[in-house]
Amino acid sequence: MKNVTDSFVSLGHWPSAGSFGFNTDILATNPINLSVVLGVLIFFGKGVLSDLLDNRKQRILNTIRNSEELRGGAIEQLEKARARLRKVEMEAEQFRVNGYSEIEQEKLNLINSTYKTLEQLENYKNETIHFEQQRAINQVRQRVFQQALQGALGTLNSCLNNELHLRTISANIGMFGAMKEITD
């Protein structure tokens, strides 16, 4: 191993005039070495670097294109959603207005129905009162008639004696006989 190290050290001491070798002077060799390395890198790496940059550029452009398409789709969906929202808001407003109208209509219908029911109940009450009045009047008439009839019968019974009774019967028989002759 010592031989290998000695050979590298001996290479470092070679004279630089007219021969190829390593220059160990860092300040003198850096710009030259750097320019050689850069030249080799530029010459050989230019194609690779160009391909890498082109690939990267294509990926970025594809990403931007996809993003633009997604953005366009999102804007389109947003507009559709806004249109649906406006439509739903209009329908909700219509339902609200119709709901209030229907509530007012139902309220009026209920009031009218209640009024009609009260009117019918009032008519029924009046009919019932009239019926009860007629019934009471008829009962009073019947009682008055019965009392008058009983009074008349009582008066007739008290006034009639046998003689008057026989004369009344004879008069009635005579009237029937006369009526029979007229009809024959």
UniProtKB/Swiss-Prot annotation:
Keyword entries, A-Z: ATP synthesis, CF(0), Chloroplast, Hydrogen ion transport, Ion transport, Membrane, Plastid, Thylakoid, Transmembrane, Transmembrane helix, Transport
Membrane topology: Single-pass membrane protein
Subcellular location: Plastid, Chloroplast thylakoid membrane
InterPro entries for this protein: ATP_synth_b/b'su_bac/chlpt (IPR002146)
Top-level taxon of the source organism: Eukaryota
Gene Ontology terms for molecular function: proton-transporting ATP synthase activity, rotational mechanism
Main location: plastid
CDD domains named in the record: ATP-synt_Fo_b
Note: In plastids the F-type ATPase is also known as CF(1)CF(0).
UniProt subunit comment: F-type ATPases have 2 components, F(1) - the catalytic core - and F(0) - the membrane proton channel. F(1) has five subunits: alpha(3), beta(3), gamma(1), delta(1), epsilon(1). F(0) has four main subunits: a(1), b(1), b'(1) and c(10-14). The alpha and beta chains form an alternating ring which encloses part of the gamma chain. F(1) is attached to F(0) by a central stalk formed by the gamma and epsilon chains, while a peripheral stalk is formed by the delta, b and b' chains.
Job description of the protein: F(1)F(0) ATP synthase produces ATP from ADP in the presence of a proton or sodium gradient. F-type ATPases consist of two structural domains, F(1) containing the extramembraneous catalytic core and F(0) containing the membrane proton channel, linked together by a central stalk and a peripheral stalk. During catalysis, ATP synthesis in the catalytic domain of F(1) is coupled via a rotary mechanism of the central stalk subunits to proton translocation.
Family to which the UniProt record says this protein belongs: Belongs to the ATPase B chain family.
Protein name (database record): ATP synthase subunit b, chloroplastic
Organism expressing this protein natively: Eucalyptus globulus subsp. globulus
